[in-house]
Amino acid sequence: QRQMCIRDSPMAGSEKTGYENSSSSIIKGARYIITPTKETKPEKIEFMKQFASDVGMNPIVMDYHVHDKSVAAISHVPHLLSTALVHVVSDNDDEEKHMQLLAAGCFRDMSRVAASSPEMWEQICLTNSSAISNILEQYIEMLETIKDNIDKKTPGYVASLFEMSREYRNSLESRHPEH
């Protein structure tokens, strides 16, 4: 008899690790993604949905391809970008550590998840490597386009990029009113 397995992903977390940093409030209202296979029995899916609801999470059932691409874009690659940001700043900081001294809101916001568990994130990245690689390729292309336009001092390019990003980011508030 074949065993059934349902992949799940609680969309909640922190850069802090260990039991001493655990908190039940972190999952309250968070999305809980359930990715069944074609063989998964409906009652197993319902069990997982009920479990998620019982612990205060919002269950969402989706195809695993959609899940893998989505979490690569909204979680896995941002963790890698945060890590890359910290590496670039660290490599460019001077002996007096002026960059470290001046690091404030933007840098702190964007670098927070770089303090996450290296072991856990290595496993996550290796497990979802194909989707992550596809999203990273898009970032590389976008960064090259941004660099080209900044080098050329293209009028309006940077403003339009920020405007589009601001609109999408602000639209998240309607999807996540609790944050």
For every predicted segment, state its role.
Residues 24-111:
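Internal alpha-helical scaffold of NAD(P)-dependent oxidoreductase catalytic cores
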Residues 85-92, 147-154, 173-176:
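Long, hydrophobic, amphipathic alpha-helical segments used as structural scaffolds
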Residues 10-27, 33:
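Glycine-/Pro-rich loop/turn segments that contact NAD(P) or position catalytic residues
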Residues 167-179:
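Long, positively charged, glycine-interspersed low-complexity recognition regions
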Residues 7-10, 61-63:
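Beta-strand->loop->alpha-helix junctions that form or flank phosphate-binding loops
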Residues 96-165:
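Interdomain hinge/lid region at the active-site interface
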